[in-house]
Amino acid sequence: MPEGPEVKLFVDELNHNFRYYQIKSINVLSGRYIKNPIQNLSLLLNKEIESFNCKGKFIWIDLDDLIIFNTLGMTGNWSRTKTKHSRIEIEFYENDKLYFNDIRSFGTFQIKTRSDLEKKLKSIGPDMLSNPPNNFVNLLRKYNHKNICCVLMNQNIVSGIGNYIKAESLWYSRINPYSFIKDLKVENLITLDKA
């Protein structure tokens, strides 16, 4: 599953290649959105992509008054290449195309408003890459009664951490994944913050 670092790389690449492109057409090619159509898809036509952004694993595409919410799920990605797993095709007036590919169809694509975005961003914890918590130890101590893995994987507490980052960080910090936060030394949590 793409985690914070991979999502950030996708977003950086999308901004580099497609920022300020204008949407000519958008088509659902396959997957779940054939049976359950995306609401208000036609509203995206002729919109200019102002920016691609992310917080943790959550991606949003800013189209001024509209926002596209996107998650990659287990196997999603954005590419110029159409594959048999391409779910959505976006064609631009700039003679280019962008495909949302998703082998397992766990990714999401929704059209929302700016107020929806504000609510969504408030519900997501601080981004592990660009906005780590100022006081990581105190943040974790709020969840003393919980298992360290459950807290790290909860995107509402700290966003962008998935299985491999959790495993590598805990190993580096010498923290048993079955530990409860209350049983951990401050030194372990400080090392975890740096991991």
Role assignments for model-derived ranges:
Residues 34-38, 163-164, 179-181, 192-194:
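Short amphipathic alpha-helical patches
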Residues 64-172, 180:
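Phosphate/anion-contacting hairpin/loop surfaces
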Residues 3-6, 161, 192:
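Hydrophobic (often cysteine-bearing) scaffold residues that line and stabilize catalytic clefts
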Residues 24, 31, 40, 153, ...:
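Flexible domain-boundary/linker segments
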Residues 10-13, 17, 26, 43, ...:
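Residues that form generic nucleotide/phosphate-binding pockets
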Residues 1-111:
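Surface-exposed binding/hinge segments that line
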Residues 171-195:
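A broadly conserved sequence feature marking short terminus-proximal activation segments
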